[in-house]
């Protein structure tokens, strides 16, 4: 018994020493950001609303300040709330905060191997290669503008064939936007009646709805439990696997038909790069990273822009007076005959302001795509341990009431000077900022402007309900804000 007592005492002493050493190490490094007390397993789930995480984080920022800690289940997250801290972290200390954090659902779907979710040297090499190669295949150049103009023409013709029948434009918009990124990464566009592509559009559309389900939100808190439970989150995962297979099959077909001397698209260029690095055991260019990067580019090049355009049509058919003013500007600068082009935008301050306000108002990614610190980091007066998940809240910037008075109201005046000229704002960062800024920002801006002005050049938007009953409030999900379902008639002008 005495030996057992001595052993117990020694064990307690050792544990105490370890706890003291841990406390001393942390105290020397500095205090971590404050936050609500977290409970075992559930973290702060009882103190926040998983149905509306951005709203809960806003309320916590009012109590704990612009830098605070919250626990999503067992996952610790440091939240950055407000323009100053977001800019300071992502730009001024951009390297420290350049890691890609991952919520459980994102990790489940993307596996951390493509350009969006990878880290370290893999991410650096893939991003550098993607930016160079996408430019080589026209992104940001005159060639891609002409492709968008051509696709806008196909979209307009398709809308004319609806003969003013009320419809949900979601599928049409996804198809048009997808064809732009498809022409770059796959080397060709898809016909609007292509059955395999229509199935792909259906999976994407369904997932846009499924991610609003509470089960999808809860997956980010309790992934292990949710993996075993039935529900819409399981269908979301299965649909994603189908989209993954669609892009992987195209990659496999490219392998069979590759002509190294004449690369047709991004996939061919990547396959050539793989061949060049064949003898390099540490090469980041593998068939796995090609498949994941292709999927990343396809989804990123489709999702953000098509959903923004869905929001745009929803918002604008609520405000016919705004549409009328845009159409006057379109008729004056572009006319009814030729296609809109990016060079027109500088002469169309009201239209430019409306597009900026749409992106600001919808706040597409309220918590941003999560970041992580790549090393132990001193930020302001706080210590943030390496690999800590970071939420740089874009909603806190896009809905800042000092920069944008009455931010919850849709108002193009947020981007107009008193004399009607366009007003820039440093707070406009729907594509994020810093080292992880969206690689396709330029392409997305071009698509949104050309597609939207082409639609308004040719059609008046006719609602199927009274204007005052049109709900433009975004539906909040754990990953992105989504528009309500709606129908609208496209009446030729």
Question: Where on the chain are the PLM-derived regions?
Answer:
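Terminal signal-anchor or tail-anchor transmembrane helices
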Residues: 1-28, 179
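Cytochrome P450 substrate-recognition site 1
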Residues: 29-147, 168-169, 173-183, 196-225, ...
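Classical protein tyrosine phosphatase
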Residues: 32-37, 79-89, 96-98, 187-198, ...
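Conserved cytochrome P450 K-helix E-x-x-R motif and the immediately C-terminal K′/meander segment
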Residues: 45-58, 62-65, 242-249, 339-381, ...
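Cytochrome P450 heme-thiolate monooxygenase catalytic core
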Residues: 99-107, 141-309, 325, 475
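Cytochrome P450 heme-binding "Cys pocket" and the immediately downstream C-terminal segment
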Residues: 320-322, 441-479
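Cytochrome P450 heme-thiolate "Cys pocket" and heme-binding signature region
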Residues: 380, 418-448, 474-475
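Conserved cytochrome P450 K-helix/beta-meander segment immediately N-terminal to the heme-binding cysteine loop
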Residues: 392-420
């Amino acid at each position: 018994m005495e030996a057992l007592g001595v052993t117990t005492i020694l064990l307690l002493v050792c544990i105490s020493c370890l706890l003291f050493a841990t406390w001393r190490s942390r105290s020397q490094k500095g205090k971590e950001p404050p936050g609500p007390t977290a409970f075992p397993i559930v973290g702060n789930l009882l103190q926040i609303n998983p149905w509306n995480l951005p709203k809960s984080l806003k309320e916590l920022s009012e109590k704990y300040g612009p830098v605070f800690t919250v626990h999503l289940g067992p996952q610790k997250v440091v939240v950055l709330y407000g323009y100053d801290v977001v800019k300071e972290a992502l730009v001024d200390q951009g390297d420290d905060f350049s890691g890609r954090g991952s919520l459980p659902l994102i990790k489940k779907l993307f596996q951390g191997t493509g350009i969006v979710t990878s880290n370290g040297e893999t991410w650096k090499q893939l991003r550098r290669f993607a930016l160079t190669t996408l430019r080589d295949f026209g992104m940001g150049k005159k060639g891609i503008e002409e492709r968008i103009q051509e696709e806008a023409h196909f979209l307009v013709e398709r809308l004319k064939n609806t003969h003013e029948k009320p419809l949900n434009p979601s599928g049409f918009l996804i198809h048009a936007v997808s064809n732009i990124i498809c022409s770059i990464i796959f080397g060709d566009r898809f016909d609007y009646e292509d059955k395999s592509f229509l199935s792909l559009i259906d999976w994407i559309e369904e997932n846009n709805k499924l991610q609003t389900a509470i089960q999808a939100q809860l997956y980010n808190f309790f992934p292990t439990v949710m993996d075993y439970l039935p529900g819409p989150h399981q269908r979301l995962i299965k649909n994603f696997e189908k989209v993954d297979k669609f892009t992987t099959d195209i990659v496999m077909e490219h392998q069979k038909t590759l002509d190294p001397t004449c690369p047709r698209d991004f996939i061919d260029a990547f396959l050539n790069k793989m061949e060049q690095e064949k003898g390099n055991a540490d090469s980041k260019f593998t068939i796995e990273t090609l498949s994941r990067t292709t999927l990343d580019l396809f989804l990123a090049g489709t999702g953000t822009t098509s959903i923004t355009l869905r929001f745009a049509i929803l918002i604008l058919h609520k405000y016919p007076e705004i549409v009328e003013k845009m159409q006057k500007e379109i008729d004056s600068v572009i006319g009814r005959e030729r296609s809109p082009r990016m060079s027109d935008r500088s002469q169309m301050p009201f239209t430019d302001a409306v597009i900026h306000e749409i992106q600001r108002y919808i706040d597409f990614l309220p918590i941003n795509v999560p970041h992580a610190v790549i090393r132990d980091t001193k930020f302001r007066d706080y210590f943030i341990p390496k690999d800590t998940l970071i939420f740089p809240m874009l909603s806190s910037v896009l809905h800042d009431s000092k920069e944008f008075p009455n931010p919850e109201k849709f108002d193009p005046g947020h981007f107009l000077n008193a004399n009607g000229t366009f007003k820039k704002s440093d707070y406009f960062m729907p594509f994020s900022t810093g080292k992880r800024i969206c690689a396709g920002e330029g392409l997305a801006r071009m698509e949104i402007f050309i597609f939207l002005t082409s639609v308004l050049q040719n059609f008046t938007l006719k609602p199927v309900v009274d204007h005052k009953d049109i709900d433009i409030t975004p539906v909040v999900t754990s990953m992105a804000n989504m528009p309500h379902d709606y129908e609208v008639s496209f009446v030729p002008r």
